[in-house]
A protein has these predicted regions:
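Fe(II)/2-oxoglutarate oxygenase catalytic core
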Residues: 1-179, 185-211
């Protein structure tokens, strides 16, 4: 995984001591944040089928971005799942994985899930979500994003999930049940589905502002 280039930020700090003249030096601070992390096997195939059935049993609506619809940028159908007696096990499973992966790979200060789980359906021909980040002026508290691959890769073509860290997109493994964790400021997209249907489950975890 490529390291994420950090923007240059000008800070009003005291002058650094010159180590050649004594007086010590600024300590080297290591960045413990990974670009992204993944795990599989969080849900069994039968459980993934159940999640799809739960999502399909609700009313899906055309996806929008900050209340605006644009097929050029985002073309899919979504619904939100909230904790109840039918879905509590999904939230519990994800919560355990999020705590574990955040502690191991990101160490973000997190407070909880911003909203429910977004169940998304991408259908051929052409439904997609172009390059975007999950953190914005209306979603500033988002810090960690999670995407679960619900579909069997044999059930669709296209629909690749990609993350951008350098000059070339990084394609994520299409294995069913693959769960991807990445900072919400990461540029990512879902390429157009050319055949079949792709289902995913997305969560955003919030916290205080980055420091």
């Amino acid at each position: 995984m490529a390291r994420l280039d950090k923007p240059k930020i000008e800070l009003d700090l005291p002058d650094r001591p010159d180590p050649t003249r004594g007086g010590g030096a600024w300590p080297l601070m290591l960045d413990h944040v990974e670009n992204w992390a993944w795990r599989n096997g969080l849900f069994t195939p039968e459980e993934l089928d159940t999640i799809i059935s739960i999502g399909e049993s609700t009313e899906l609506v055309k996806a929008s971005t900050f209340g605006k619809q644009s097929d050029k940028n985002r073309n899919s159908f979504v619904t939100f799942l909230f904790p109840n007696e039918i879905t509590n096990w999904i939230f519990a499973r994800l919560a355990g994985a999020i705590n574990e992966m955040n502690q191991q790979f990101f160490q973000f200060d997190l407070t909880g899930m911003e909203q429910g789980l977004q169940f998304t359906k991408y259908t051929a021909p052409g439904e997609h979500y172009d390059w975007h980040i999950d953190k914005g002026h209306m979603t500033a508290s988002r810090k960690l994003s999670i995407s679960v691959q619900l579909s069997d890769p044999k059930d669709y073509k296209g629909g690749e999930f990609e993350l951008m860290f350098g000059r070339k997109p990084e394609k994520i493994n299409r294995e069913r049940g693959m769960t991807v964790f990445f900072p919400s400021y990461t540029l990512h997209r879902v390429r157009p589905v050319t055949q079949g249907t792709r289902y995913s489950l997305v969560a955003w975890i919030s916290g205080p502002p980055f420091k």
